[in-house]
C-alpha cells in the first residue's frame, strides 16, 4: 500500500511539472537553441548545450509548479483545470513549494558551471518565472511577461558563449516576446469565457474581437525580426526559406483560429512547436559547414 501511495504521489508530481505535456518545454527550447547557434555561430560547445537543454526542462517544470500554485484557488472553477494536482488535493501546497525549490536549485547548480555573466542573468530568469503566474491578476498583458520569461534564455545563451549581448540578442528576445504573446493569446482564447467569469486577465480578453488581427500583426513582426537577424549575421538563402515556411504555418494558424473555436485555437497553439523547429533548422543549416 505504501508503494502505491508513493507511486500516486510521483504521478501527481509528474502531472504538476507537465512532463507529460512537453509543448511548453519545446516552446522554451527552440529560442534557446536559436540563440546558441547564432551566438557561437553554429554548433555550441556540448557542455553549454547540455546545460541549457537540461535547464530548459528544469525551469519549465518549475514554472508549471509555481503557475499552478498561483492559480490553485482559480483552477477549481475552470473545467479544463479542475483536476490538476493542487485543486484536486493530489499534491499539497507545501509539497508544491518544496518541489519548486528543488527544481530551481538543480537548474542553478547547472548555471554555476558557466561564466559569471550568465550566473548573474539567471537571477532575472528566476524572478520572471516567479512573477509571471501572478500577473494575470493585475494586468491584461501577462503574455508579455511570459514572453520575457520564456525568452530570457536568449541573453543567457549569448552571455554563456560570448560574454556579450549584441543587437542580434535583443532582436531575438523581442521576436520571442511577440511570438509568445501570439501563441499564448491563442491558448488564452480556449479559456476566455471561463477567465472572464473568475476575473483572470489575458490578452485574449484585452484584444477582444480584434484578437486574430493582432495575432497576425505579431506574427508578421516575428518574421520581420527573424529575417533582420538573418541579414545582420549574413545567413544564407536557406534560412530565409525557413522564415517563409514559418510564415506559412502562421497563415495556417490564422485559418484555425478564424472562428475562435476552442479545439481549433488549441490546435493553433500546439502548431507553434513547428514554427520554432523550422526556424531552428533554418539556422542550423545556414551554419552547416560542408
Curated annotation (Swiss-Prot):
UniProtKB keywords: Cell inner membrane, Cell membrane, Magnesium, Membrane, Transferase, Transmembrane, Transmembrane helix, Ubiquinone biosynthesis
Q: Which GO terms of type biological process are on file? A: ubiquinone biosynthetic process
EC main class here is transferase
Needed cofactors, names only, are: Mg(2+)
The entry's localization annotation reads: Cell inner membrane
Can you cite an annotated GO cellular component?
plasma membrane
Keyword Cell inner membrane among record annotations: yes
Which InterPro entries does the UniProt entry name for this protein? Answer: HB_polyprenyltransferase-like, Prenyltransferase, UbiA_prenyltransferase, UbiA_prenylTrfase_CS, UbiA_sf
Q: Which GO terms describe its molecular function?
A: 4-hydroxybenzoate polyprenyltransferase activity
PROSITE patterns assigned to the protein according to its UniProt record, in alphabetical order: UBIA
Reactions catalysed, semicolon-separated, are: all-trans-octaprenyl diphosphate + 4-hydroxybenzoate = 4-hydroxy-3-(all-trans-octaprenyl)benzoate + diphosphate
Under Gene3D superfamilies, the record lists:
UbiA prenyltransferase
NCBIfam families reported for this sequence: ubiA_proteo
Q: Which family does it belong to?
A: Belongs to the UbiA prenyltransferase family.
In its UniProt entry, what is this protein called? 4-hydroxybenzoate octaprenyltransferase
What is the species listed in this Swiss-Prot or TrEMBL entry? Salmonella paratyphi C (strain RKS4594)
Amino acid at each position: 500500500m505504501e508503494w502505491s501511495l508513493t507511486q500516486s504521489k510521483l504521478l501527481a508530481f509528474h502531472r504538476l511539472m507537465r512532463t507529460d505535456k512537453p509543448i511548453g518545454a519545446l516552446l522554451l527550447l527552440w529560442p534557446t537553441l536559436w540563440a546558441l547557434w547564432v551566438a557561437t555561430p553554429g554548433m555550441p560547445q556540448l557542455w553549454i548545450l547540455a546545460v541549457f537543454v537540461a535547464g530548459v526542462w528544469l525551469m519549465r517544470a518549475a514554472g508549471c509548479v509555481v503557475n499552478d500554485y498561483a492559480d490553485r484557488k482559480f483552477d477549481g472553477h475552470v473545467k479544463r483545470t479542475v483536476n490538476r494536482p493542487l485543486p484536486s488535493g493530489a499534491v499539497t501546497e507545501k509539497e508544491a513549494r518544496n518541489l519548486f525549490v528543488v527544481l530551481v536549485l538543480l537548474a542553478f547548480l547547472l548555471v554555476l558551471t558557466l561564466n559569471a555573466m550568465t550566473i548573474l542573468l539567471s537571477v532575472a530568469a528566476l524572478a520572471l518565472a516567479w512573477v509571471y503566474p501572478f500577473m494575470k491578476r493585475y494586468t491584461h498583458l501577462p503574455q508579455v511577461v511570459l514572453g520575457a520569461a520564456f525568452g530570457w534564455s536568449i541573453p543567457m545563451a549569448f552571455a554563456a558563449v560570448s560574454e556579450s549581448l549584441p543587437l542580434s540578442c535583443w532582436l531575438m528576445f523581442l521576436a520571442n516576446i511577440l511570438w509568445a504573446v501570439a501563441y499564448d493569446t491563442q491558448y488564452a482564447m480556449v479559456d476566455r469565457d471561463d477567465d472572464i467569469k473568475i476575473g483572470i486577465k489575458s490578452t485574449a480578453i484585452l484584444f477582444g474581437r480584434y484578437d486574430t488581427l493582432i495575432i497576425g500583426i505579431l506574427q508578421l513582426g516575428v518574421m520581420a525580426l527573424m529575417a533582420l537577424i538573418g541579414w545582420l549575421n549574413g545567413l544564407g538563402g536557406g534560412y530565409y526559406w525557413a522564415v517563409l515556411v514559418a510564415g506559412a504555418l502562421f497563415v495556417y494558424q490564422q485559418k484555425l483560429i478564424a472562428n475562435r473555436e476552442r479545439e481549433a485555437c488549441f490546435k493553433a497553439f500546439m502548431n507553434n512547436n513547428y514554427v520554432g523547429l523550422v526556424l531552428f533548422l533554418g539556422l542550423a543549416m545556414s551554419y552547416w559547414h560542408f
